[in-house]
């Protein structure tokens, strides 16, 4: 397949909102040789997940702590395939924010575009684990998540333009100033190949479905790849049937439309190809990170220029591996792990 090519505090190498205007000149002159393979933009937080399955939160005895947030998880997943990755986001000026930075550095993700916001807390997310398909999430993002404070003037538009993959999620469109920052970033990309929108719609982050549909529609005018499940496609283009949804996304101008269908697998369409790949069947422990694992592997396959069917099989397998593990970000597989699973599937 070929796709047409507030006052804040500085922590580590994170930029603060107070300093953003001062450093803007240097931030918009990222040298080509420093370009990233993947830049994601959007949610970050700390996942506090149970270490017992089938138990409600009030009865859980032990928890694990890991970095979370869909856009951040995708950057982590892509870094597992030895790509140069970075995430554009914001944390609180608090211990969890400092943890996020240290953990991302440990996991090989650049924190160059992360700043902390005074007066707001780093988001925390709890979940319950009831395999195979019930994983209630409890988001603590009030009064406002720092990652929704990304501003236009803070963006390194040169880096965003130069990166091979620019990945965003629709949550970043839910509130200002993040909403406008995302639209400016899309305009800077100017429909460059591999400008990807994850249709990751979460109703609790939006004032109404109608507002979400409007903002996603604006974004679709600028992206070249759209990825979502049937429910997310309904918000984006008013269709739940996978084929009609993919066609509607293509009509909006994207070059590659991917519709995830859960146990029925995944459908992908371009102007010239229609590919359906069955689900990679696993014993699910926690399915919450599988979509982000799919996303990071999708970035990898597209960067490598693989045929579309191989990209989808690899991404499906990666997502399946994540679903067999308790956590999300630290559950992302390596290329060798994914290839081993694919090889094993050939002999089943």
Regions found by a protein language model. Give the residues of each.
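Conserved phosphate-binding/catalytic region of the ribokinase-like
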Residues: 7, 19-39, 187, 238-348
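Short beta-strand scaffold segments in enzyme catalytic cores
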Residues: 76, 124-128, 265-268
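Glycine-rich phosphate/adenosyl-contacting loop at the front of the ribokinase-like
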Residues: 18-110, 283-285, 348
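Conserved N-terminal subdomain of the carbohydrate kinase-like
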Residues: 84-168, 195, 339-348
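A short, aliphatic-rich alpha-helical micro-motif
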Residues: 33, 159-161, 217-220
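Active-site metal-binding loops of divalent metal-dependent hydrolases
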Residues: 44, 199, 293
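Conserved beta-alpha-beta core of the PfkB/ribokinase-like small-molecule kinase fold
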Residues: 165-248, 263-266
């Amino acid at each position: 397949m070929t796709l047409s090519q507030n006052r804040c505090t500085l922590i580590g190498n994170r930029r603060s909102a107070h300093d953003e205007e001062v450093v803007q000149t240097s931030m918009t002159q990222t040298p080509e040789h420093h370009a990233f393979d993947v830049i994601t933009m959007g949610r970050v937080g700390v996942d506090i997940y149970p270490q017992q399955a089938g138990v409600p939160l009030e009865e859980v005895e032990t928890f694990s702590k890991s970095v979370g947030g869909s856009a951040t998880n995708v950057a982590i997943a892509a870094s597992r395939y030895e790509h140069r990755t970075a995430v554009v986001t914001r944390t609180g000026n608090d211990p969890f924010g400092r943890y996020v930075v240290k953990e991302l550095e440990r996991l090989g993700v650049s924190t160059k575009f992360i700043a902390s916001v005074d007066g707001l807390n780093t988001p925390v997310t709890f979940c319950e684990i009831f395999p195979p398909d019930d994983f209630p999430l409890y988001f603590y993002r009030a009064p406002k998540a720092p990652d929704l404070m990304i501003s236009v003037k803070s963006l390194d538009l040169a880096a965003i333009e130069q990166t091979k993959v620019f990945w965003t999620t629709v949550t970043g469109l839910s509130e200002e100033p993040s909403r406008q920052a995302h639209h400016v970033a899309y305009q800077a990309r100017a429909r460059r190949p591999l400008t990807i929108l994850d249709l990751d719609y979460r109703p609790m982050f939006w004032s109404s479905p109608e507002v979400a549909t409007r903002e996603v529609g604006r974004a679709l005018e600028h992206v070249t790849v759209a990825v979502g499940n049937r429910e997310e496609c309904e918000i984006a283009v008013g269709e739940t049937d996978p084929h009609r949804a993919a066609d509607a996304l293509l009509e909006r101008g994207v070059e590659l439309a991917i519709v995830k269908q859960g146990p029925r697998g995944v459908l992908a369409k371009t102007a010239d190809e229609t590919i359906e790949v069955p689900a990679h069947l696993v014993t699910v422990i926690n399915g919450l990170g599988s979509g982000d694992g799919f996303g990071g592997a999708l970035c990898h396959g597209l960067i490598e220029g693989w045929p579309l069917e191989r990209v989808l099989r690899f991404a499906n397998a990666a997502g399946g591996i994540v679903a067999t593990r308790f956590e999300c970000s630290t559950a992302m597989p390596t290329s060798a792990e994914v290839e081993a699973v694919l090889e094993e599937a050939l002999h089943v």
